[in-house]
Design a protein with these regions (language model features):
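N-terminal alpha-helical targeting/anchoring segments
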Residues: 1-76, 90, 94
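TRNA-recognition modules of translation machinery and tRNA-sensing kinases, especially anticodon-binding
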Residues: 71-374
C-alpha cells in the first residue's frame, strides 16, 4: 500500500527515504490520473448504451417491423383530389414558408390569422383535457436546459448533433434549447428522494421545441411535418417502477382520446426494438391519417423508460420496505400541436380550400365554424 508506506516514511529522518517518499507521491499522482481517465472512458461507454427493451417489445430492425395494435376513426372520402396542408395554408394566405426562409432559414414557418388562432386553440384544448380530465399538473418550464439536465433524460451525449446549443455567459456550463418538454419536466425529480405517497406525479406543459433534425436531410422538406421549431404538449409521469406499463397504457389513452374528440382517424403501433428511442423500454406511436399522403404519420410517441432516466438523474423514493429505490419515468406527446394542425387542415378540407373547424375547438375560436380566404 503506497499511501501507508508514504506515511511511515514521513515519520523517519532518513534522507534516502525522503527521496523515496517523493517517488511514491509521483507514482500516486500517476495512478490517480489513470483512474480518472479510466473512469471517464468507462462513463462515456456506459452513457452511450441504450435502455433494454421490455419482453413485450417485438424484435425488429426498423419501422417496417412495428406492430399495429389499433385503428380508429373513419378515413374521409373526398370527391376531389385532397390538397396538402401547405397548399391549403398558402392558398388561404395563412402559412408563409417563404417569409420564414427570408427571416430565419429553411424548416420554419409563419402561421397567420385564423390558423394561428387554430394552433393556439389546439394547444389550449389539449391542456384543458389533460388538466381537468386526466389529472395532470400544468407547468410552464424554462425552455433552456443545462448539459447535466440533457444527460439525465438521455439526449446527451449520444444525440448532441441534434441539439441547439446556445452561447451563454463565458465560462458558464453548456446550455441547450429543449428538444422536448420531457427533458425539463422529468428533471423536476433530479437528485431527489420523493415521498412514495406523492406518486404518481403527472406533469403537462405546452412549449416550443427545437431540433436540428440531423440525419433527416431531404426528408419532408416541404411543409410543417419536420421543422426546427414546433409546439408540443408533453405529458410526463413519475411512478413506482412496478406501475410503468400500466401508466404507459393510461398515458397513451390520454393521447388517443384527444384524436377521438377531434374526430381524426388514427392508428396505434408498438415500436419494434430497432425503432425505439434511446431511453425507452417500450413505446407506442400514434399515427394520424394524412389524406394528401394517403398514409398515417406520427403525431405522438408515448414511452416507458422504467428506471433508465432515474438512474442517470439519481431520482428515487422509499418503498414499503423502507428501501430507497429508483422511480420509473414516462413521457408522451399529447399531442404534437403542429402535426395536429396539419391533420385538421387535411382531414377537414373542403373542395373550395376552406377548412371546417372541429366542433370541440369552436369554443376556443370565438365559435368560428369555417376558415376561408377573405
Amino acid at each position: 500500500n503506497l499511501e501507508k508506506e508514504k506515511k511511515d516514511i514521513s515519520k523517519s529522518k532518513d534522507e534516502s527515504l525522503f527521496k523515496k517518499s517523493k517517488e511514491i507521491s509521483s507514482e500516486l499522482d500517476k495512478i490517480s490520473t489513470q483512474q480518472k481517465n479510466t473512469k471517464t472512458e468507462l462513463d462515456n461507454i456506459l452513457s452511450g448504451i441504450p435502455n433494454i427493451p421490455h419482453p413485450d417489445v417485438p424484435n425488429g430492425k426498423d419501422e417496417n417491423d412495428n406492430l399495429e395494435v389499433l385503428k380508429a376513426g373513419k378515413v374521409p372520402e373526398f370527391d376531389f383530389k385532397p390538397k396538402s396542408h401547405y397548399e391549403l395554408g398558402e392558398n388561404l394566405g395563412m402559412l408563409d414558408f417563404d417569409l420564414a426562409t427570408k427571416t430565419t432559414g429553411s424548416r420554419f414557418v409563419f402561421v397567420k390569422k385564423e390558423l394561428a388562432l387554430l394552433e393556439r386553440a389546439l394547444s389550449n384544448f389539449m391542456l384543458d383535457i389533460h388538466i381537468v380530465q386526466n389529472g395532470y399538473q400544468e407547468i410552464s418550464p424554462p425552455l433552456i436546459a443545462s448539459e447535466n439536465t440533457m444527460y439525465g433524460t438521455g439526449q446527451l451525449p449520444k444525440f448532441e448533433n441534434d441539439q441547439f446549443e446556445i452561447k451563454f455567459d463565458e465560462g458558464s456550463d453548456r446550455k441547450y434549447l429543449i428538444p422536448t418538454a420531457e427533458v425539463i419536466l422529468t428533471n423536476i425529480v433530479k437528485d431527489k428522494i420523493v415521498d412514495q405517497k406523492d406518486l404518481p406525479m403527472r406533469y403537462v406543459a405546452s412549449t416550443p421545441c427545437f431540433r436540428k433534425e440531423a440525419g433527416s436531410y431531404g426528408k419532408d422538406t416541404k411543409g410543417m411535418i419536420r421543422q426546427h421549431q414546433f409546439y408540443k404538449v408533453e405529458m410526463v409521469s413519475i411512478v413506482e417502477k412496478e406501475n410503468c406499463l400500466e401508466e404507459l397504457e393510461r398515458m397513451t389513452n390520454c393521447a388517443t382520446d384527444l384524436l377521438d374528440k377531434l374526430e381524426l382517424p388514427y392508428r396505434k403501433v408498438i415500436l419494434c426494438s430497432g425503432d425505439m428511442g434511446f431511453s425507452a423500454e417500450k413505446t407506442y406511436d400514434i399515427e394520424v391519417w394524412l389524406p394528401s399522403e394517403n398514409k398515417y404519420r406520427e403525431i405522438s410517441s408515448c414511452s416507458s423508460c422504467s428506471t433508465f432516466q432515474a438512474q442517470r438523474m439519481k431520482s428515487r423514493y422509499k418503498n414499503k420496505n423502507k428501501e430507497t429505490v429508483f422511480v420509473g419515468t414516462l413521457n408522451g406527446s399529447g399531442l404534437a400541436v403542429g402535426r395536429t394542425l396539419i391533420a385538421v387542415l387535411e382531414n377537414y378540407q373542403q373542395k373550395d380550400g376552406s377548412i371546417i373547424v372541429p366542433k370541440v375547438l369552436r369554443p376556443y375560436m370565438n365559435n368560428l365554424e369555417l376558415i376561408s380566404a377573405k
